[in-house]
């Protein structure tokens, strides 16, 4: 799992690449905590190269969304693959995020 973070002004883009399984989620906690610090603005999670997401990965997304809500920011999830979109639909996460 690779996460590339780029900030310009109040917009932060995090490009996720690979599988966000349980182990990768544990290894990505620090990067998601860094995103929470930037959650006053807009955080875009670019999922165009995200192949898989586990419940641990979903927890990271949800924690980031809660931080953004608290700080008056927002999280946008962008370019979900069909397989990852199905996970979001089954778990009800389609109702929790703004999608592009």
Language-model features, listed with the residues they occupy:
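Short acidic-hydrophobic, aromatic-tinged amphipathic segments that line or gate anion-handling sites
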Residues: 98-100
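Amphipathic alpha-helical interaction surfaces in cytosolic regulatory modules
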Residues: 19-96
